[in-house]
A protein has these predicted regions:
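Short helix/strand-capping turn motifs
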Residues: 1-92
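C-terminal charged interaction modules
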Residues: 85-108
């Protein structure tokens, strides 16, 4: 399994370099099969943006979120590759379901 594409769907930057929110879509599939993949989405939010926008009375428990101090797209790719590595199974469907524990899998 590999990342076949990583697309930014939404980008928001504040006044500071450490104030941001991104929405991503990632295509993950077997390296040896062209075109075969599953689509997942996730959000990336800075600690500063989360602290500012998050309700003082709320609790957040959700998959499909990455929280980062600074924006680094290469680090994001490495994190997704790590998720894929942890999720690999001989059965691709099981691998896809394992990845879905971390990222939101789009419905077919």
């Amino acid at each position: 399994m590999i990342i076949k594409a990583l697309n930014s769907l939404q980008e928001e930057f504040g006044d500071d370099i450490d104030d941001f929110f991104f929405s991503y879509q990632v295509f993950i599939g077997p390296e040896e099969v062209d075109g075969a993949c599953e689509v997942y989405d996730f959000n990336l939010i800075s600690i500063k943006r989360l602290a500012r926008d998050f309700s003082d009375f709320g609790i957040m428990l959700n998959r499909g979120w990455m929280i980062s101090k600074y924006f680094d797209e290469e680090q994001i790719k490495r994190e997704i590759e790590y998720i894929i590595k942890k999720s690999i199974n001989k059965d691709n469907e099981i691998s896809y379901n394992n990845i879905a524990m971390f990222l939101r899998r789009e419905e077919q």
